[in-house]
Amino acid sequence: MIRAGIIGATGYTGLELVRLLKNHPEAKITYLSSRTYAGKKLEEVFPSTLENSILSEFDPEKVSKNCDVLFTALPAGASYDLVRELKGVKIIDLGADFRFDDPGVYREWYGKELSGYENIKRVYGLPELHREEIKNAQVVGNPGCYPTSVILALAPALKHNLVDPETILVDAKSGVSGAGRKEKVDYLFSEVNESLRPYNVAKHRHVPEMEQELGKISGKKVNVVFTPHLVPMTRGILSTIYVKTDKSLEEIHEAYLEFYRNEPFVHVLPMGIYPSTKWCYGSNHVFIGMQMEERTNTLILMSAIDNLVKGASGQAVQNMNIMFGLDETKGLEFTPIYP
């Protein structure tokens, strides 16, 4: 059995990790940490978890002794120094601290210097693109939720030079859980209910992550114009992407079917069928649809994911499976919740 620990176990992604790992046939939870609720049983704070493990403050000695893998479900900037204290434990970080090739990009967008970053061997944890590297990784930077939806939607088109990478327009909509479990007026029920609003326009921190990975795929410089929106639902991301092309929809669709033919979690929809966030609710599945706007030679791509599962904790478990030589669908085989 894989001994798994979670730091930040009482945030939304941490709780989702608890749910997934409790139902994983090859893993068991051996360490849970929460600064806010240290000393309490998890089920005292969140009865739905049915988990009687006691939450503790972070203790690197306990982690090294009791864990084979540690999931760090902390805000950006909080994991880096903790991880550097650990030896002999595989790390899957759900924050942004290990996602970037260039620490200067992280410094520019997240405002923190990562001392010694170049000495840490890390892999960007998007299995559909980096499966082989993940197999031997010691530290995995789990992708962000928006980048997961956008990169998977664009990867085949950029890989096969089917679209112009110079300017990619992304309009994305996310459920409120994407903002994390925090007290803020913007996320009160009366503020988000029956409301739709953009946020972090032209300055969202996920943009450089998208451009880094999409640039690797295409081999060219990629420019992403990204506008996220908050919608009154708990889970889910729907990304709609606009990109220029001189190819036919049929050719592009066939390329997508071939690219994702053997991927267990990515589903390319028939032409004329468009994805819904309801289809992936509570699951690790991704649905991709497409249409051509022929007047302007614009390919419109649409992708739907659950931001807490494939966009965070489910993808982290998928990475764990790969790192430990398991079938990557282990513990993730369940179908989405519907309705």
Swiss-Prot record:
Alphabetized UniProt keyword annotations: Amino-acid biosynthesis, Arginine biosynthesis, Cytoplasm, NADP, Oxidoreductase
InterPro entries xref list: AGPR_AS, AGPR_type-1, NAD(P)-bd_dom_sf, NAGSA_dehydrogenase, Semialdehyde_DH_NAD-bd
Main location: cytoplasm
Domain of life the protein comes from: Bacteria
Gene3D superfamilies associated with the record: Dihydrodipicolinate Reductase, domain 2 (3.30.360.10), NAD(P)-binding Rossmann-like Domain (3.40.50.720)
Record localization: Cytoplasm
One GO term of the biological process aspect: L-arginine biosynthetic process
Keyword field contains Oxidoreductase: yes
Catalytic activity: N-acetyl-L-glutamate 5-semialdehyde + phosphate + NADP(+) = N-acetyl-L-glutamyl 5-phosphate + NADPH + H(+)
GO molecular function terms noted in the UniProt entry: N-acetyl-gamma-glutamyl-phosphate reductase activity; NAD binding; NADP+ binding
Pathway(s) annotated for this protein in UniProt: Amino-acid biosynthesis; L-arginine biosynthesis; N(2)-acetyl-L-ornithine from L-glutamate: step 3/4
Positions annotated as active site in the UniProt record: 145
This enzyme's EC code(s): 1.2.1.38
Cellular component GO terms, alphabetical: cytoplasm
Keyword Transmembrane helix tagged: no
Pfam annotation, one family: Semialdhyde_dhC_1
Similarity remark: Belongs to the NAGSA dehydrogenase family. Type 1 subfamily.
Xref: PANTHER family: N-ACETYL-GAMMA-GLUTAMYL-PHOSPHATE REDUCTASE, CHLOROPLASTIC-RELATED, N-ACETYL-GAMMA-GLUTAMYL-PHOSPHATE REDUCTASE, CHLOROPLASTIC-RELATED-RELATED
The protein's role, per its UniProt record: Catalyzes the NADPH-dependent reduction of N-acetyl-5-glutamyl phosphate to yield N-acetyl-L-glutamate 5-semialdehyde.
Protein name: N-acetyl-gamma-glutamyl-phosphate reductase
Species annotation: Thermotoga sp. (strain RQ2)
Phylogenetic classification of the source organism: Bacteria, Thermotogati, Thermotogota, Thermotogae, Thermotogales
